[in-house]
Amino acid sequence: GLQPGHHHPLPAAGAEVLEGGVTRVMKEFKLRVFRYDPEKDAQHHYQTWTVDYREGMTVLEALLWVFEKKDPSLAFRYSCREAICGSCAMYISGRYALACKVQVKDALEGDTVTVSPLPHMRVIKDLVVDQTKFWENYARVKPWLINDDPAPERERLQSPEDRARYN
């Protein structure tokens, strides 16, 4: 038992506190991934790997671990790894998410993380979907600033007055 003045230490990330204060640290987990190769498969299936867990590991890092250590045929997209570009958008354990942002510990269902491609999009291979319609709509919407004036030779600086208007 604890002596007066002593406290239970906080469990490490990836640790689970069981009954009686016993701590179990996660060393590995199962990654269940949607697989489909139109050149080989009549229909999709799921494949599961046991992955070595590391504190703070993201789902993207788990996919890269599988690609590098277990199966270099696994297909998925990623780019910035900073939750900005959206390239690694997937359906992770029942929710839409960016694989580079979601930590494994937050996506676990029991001891398993399930990863599927975005629904309602044609699957090219595994987790890679056809984004043609998305990019067509993106270009149609033009989600960028359109300038009526020619570009200046120097950058445009925001005045303190302009800045104050936006605060």
Question: Each predicted region: which residue ranges?
Answer:
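Charged/polar low-complexity intrinsically disordered segments
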Residues: E16-E19
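Signature of N-terminal electron-transfer/Fe-S-associated modules in redox systems
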Residues: G5-L10, G21-N167
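Low-complexity/repetitive intrinsically disordered segments
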Residues: G1-L2
